[in-house]
Amino acid sequence: MRKYQIDFQRVPVGQTFCSGGNEWFKRSTRTAHIINPVEYRGVWFYFGNLDKCTMYLQTKKGI
């Protein structure tokens, strides 16, 4: 699995990403809710378009 940094505006709606040590689900062009940690699941926040996020790319074994 490879990770890369991307601006929030480039994360597709419906995609998961990481920011600030939490795992998030992008709900709209400006909002996302926490998936992990579980005790904060469902709490949502506004993000700036240029806020940095980490995305993970699944790679096939041997590539």
Predicted regions and their residues:
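Short intrinsically disordered terminal tails
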Residues: 1-2, 59-63
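Mixed-charge, Lys/Arg-rich low-complexity intrinsically disordered regions
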Residues: 1-12
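Acidic, low-complexity, intrinsically disordered interaction modules
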Residues: 17-60
